[in-house]
UniProtKB/Swiss-Prot annotation:
Name used for this protein in its record: Glutathione S-transferase C-terminal domain-containing protein homolog
Any one GO CC term of the record: cytoplasm
Parts forming coiled coils: none
Domain GST C-terminal per the UniProt entry, residue ranges: 121-276
InterPro entries recorded: Glutathione-S-Trfase_C_sf, Methyltranfer_dom, SAM-dependent_MTases_sf
Family of the protein in this entry: Belongs to the GSTCD family.
Domain of life: Eukaryota
Length: 586
């Protein structure tokens, strides 16, 4: 039986007990109730101290679930995943654990045999499939609106309607984006009022040359004309937000219509919210709130209106030269030359992957280069590892590095972490074929991992992901082995700012740093098409600069760091390797 772990906090005052939960766990519980409490899923509650805004639950509605055998204390939990991941967590197949609001709610639905329920996952079951780092829409549902509700339950007093409400109203005013929209438009145009089809000779013709904006298809639900998991998540969140907004709902007619559509389509959405949620005492008066101005862009990534060239950073050679000149003040040598190498070839790939060379879609030469990259990474990790270590392969993909480490380090626990379900399933399949028992699989974003570990590894984690991995290693005082990638994709985040090291921060601004990072992506293999030697040499220099900054930041945190290159160097243009061993607490 699958397991669902939800976060609760038990508070007793004046002999009265109140059960609180986090917003994310509330959404998972809400989805579980909407699915009519499926028999193949057991709900478990994890007692902890909820850090952000907490929601009071109607405990009378949870008598069956809130029993001693289904409540555990997080610190005393026997299951490591409960301590490793942010709740809620979905466990399936005994060794796979899923974290993240949308991913957990999707899995609750996907594991149901009822095909009608699985239609909630949308076309090709892809609704909210992309992780929040890659999808503006997933981020809106999983992070932005959740954060608003959380802050409201921390006591936030509104002076204006939250931006997220305005953005959703604008989203509902955008043209519908859906698969086969022209077919849907033809069917809609050729139906009578009672739903019958119009005779062939009177049919309206609509072809692909008609602009989508002119198709008479309007948002009935959040993603178009079908009720999906996006509606299931947003409905309770926005209902709660409007409870804190006084009399503002009439000022958002499309959102109001959307609420009415859902209430008439399936009244259980409102009923479940009423059954589970204890409304806060009204803290907002009857006065009207102001409505903020927000850019009228859709919540989908591929929106031409979002492309604003003035807001993008373009790199001119003059700006690069100026940034490099500022760095000269530090009098540092930016080099990846090192006496330390990890390119020893000790792996019998035929034994590990007897049929992979034949079945792989990769050409033989590229397959060989990939194996060389993996061998360098594995050798570096082995040089740091001790029996009993917990080793995390961040951004693991289909698990090639993790599985190699599991084979080379049978006394260590290997955590395979990847946010794409399909890739993780491939990794599980290979681990099963090799009968590995020391692998655990976590489907989640890097930020959802909060556990302790001894070594962190990442092979070509894209852009800022490498810096998030390094940040995780510093948090856990863990050694690290990182081969960075996509330098030009570096972007500041709320918890990551550039430059990274104190020494770089003294001479470079964020824009200076990003000019250098963009230039680092010009490092191509010498002799390839369109490769200018002077441009490539400058790109290699900028790669060394960015990774030197990473090295300095780690050294400031008490690490001894080796910056070297993979061997042979031709195995990948992005061949830098950072190997860090924690030596002292500053």
């Amino acid at each position: 039986m699958d397991q669902l772990y939800l976060e609760i906090e038990i508070s007793t005052q004046n002999a009265e007990t109140t059960i609180y939960t986090s917003v994310s766990s509330f959404l998972a519980l809400y989805t579980y109730r909407y699915l009519n409490e499926p028999k193949n899923i057991q709900v478990n509650f994890v007692a902890t101290k909820i850090e952000s805004g907490k929601i009071a639950l109607r405990s009378s509605q949870l008598r069956r679930e809130l029993t001693d055998q289904h409540i555990t204390c997080r610190e005393a939990a026997k299951l490591p995943a409960i301590r490793d991941l942010r709740l809620p967590i979905y466990e399936k197949d005994g060794n796979t654990f899923i974290a993240g609001t949308c991913a957990v709610c999707r899995e609750l639905i996907a594991r149901q045999p009822n095909t009608e329920l699985r239609k909630l996952l949308g076309f090709k079951e892809s609704c909210l499939l992309a992780p929040s780092e890659a999808s503006i829409w997933t981020r809106f549902c999983e992070v932005d609106v959740v954060d608003v509700v959380s802050r409201l339950h921390e006591g936030l007093l509104l002076k204006a309607v939250p931006d997220e409400v305005v953005r959703f109203e604008q989203h509902m005013n955008e043209p519908v984006r859906m698969h086969n929209i022209y077919k849907q438009a033809r069917e809609q145009a050729n139906q009578t009022e009672n739903g019958a089809k119009i005779k062939r000779k009177h049919r309206v013709q609509i072809d692909g040359r008609t602009p989508k904006e002119q198709l008479l298809i309007e948002h009935r639900f959040a993603e178009g004309i079908s009720f999906t998991i996006a509606d299931l998540i947003l409905y309770p969140l926005l209902r709660i937000v409007f409870q804190h907004c006084g009399q503002m709902l009439p000022h958002f007619p499309l959102t109001s219509t959307w609420f009415s559509e859902i209430d008439s389509f399936d009244g259980t959405c409102a009923k479940i919210l009423g059954d589970l949620y204890v409304p806060q005492a009204a803290s907002q008066g009857e006065e009207l709130l102001s409505i903020p101005d927000c850019d009228a862009t859709s919540l989908y990534k591929a929106d031409p209106k979002r492309y604003k060239p003035r807001n993008r950073i373009y790199t001119s050679q003059a700006e690069v030269d100026l940034a490099l000149a500022k760095l000269s003040e530090l009098q540092l040598v930016f080099s990846t030359d090192s006496e330390h190498t990890y390119g020893q070839q000790t792996i019998d790939w035929q034994k590990i992957e007897p049929t992979h060379a034949k079945s792989s879609a990769l050409p033989q030469e590229r397959l060989e280069r990939k194996r060389q990259q993996l061998e360098n990474m594995a050798n570096a990790v082995v040089s740091l590892a001790q029996p009993g270590d917990r080793i995390v392969d961040f951004c693991s993909g289909t698990g090639h590095l993790a599985i190699l480490l599991a084979l080379k380090l049978p006394l260590c626990t290997i955590i395979v972490m990847e946010n794409k379900s399909f890739s993780l399933a491939q990794a599980q399949k290979r681990a099963l074929e090799l009968e590995l028992s020391n692998c655990v699989f976590y489907q989640c974003n890097i930020d959802y991992f909060v556990g302790r570990f001894d070594i962190g590894a990442s092979l070509h984690a894209c852009g800022t992901a490498t810096d998030i991995v390094l940040q995780q290693c510093r948090r856990s005082v863990a050694h690290f082995v990182c081969c960075p990638c996509c330098y030009g994709s570096l972007q500041p985040m709320p918890h990551i700012s550039y430059p990274l090291s104190q020494r770089f921060q003294r001479v470079l601004s964020t824009n200076d740093y990003l000019y250098i990072a963009h230039t680092a992506d010009q490092a191509h293999e010498m002799g390839t098409t369109n490769c200018k030697p002077e441009t490539t040499l400058q790109g290699l220099q900028c790669m060394s600069i960015v990774d030197t900054d990473r090295k300095l930041q780690s050294e400031e945190a008490g690490y001894q760091v080796i910056l070297t290159r993979l061997k042979p160097e031709q195995c990948t243009p992005k061949n830098h390797l950072l190997v860090g061993r924690f030596v002292k607490q500053n």
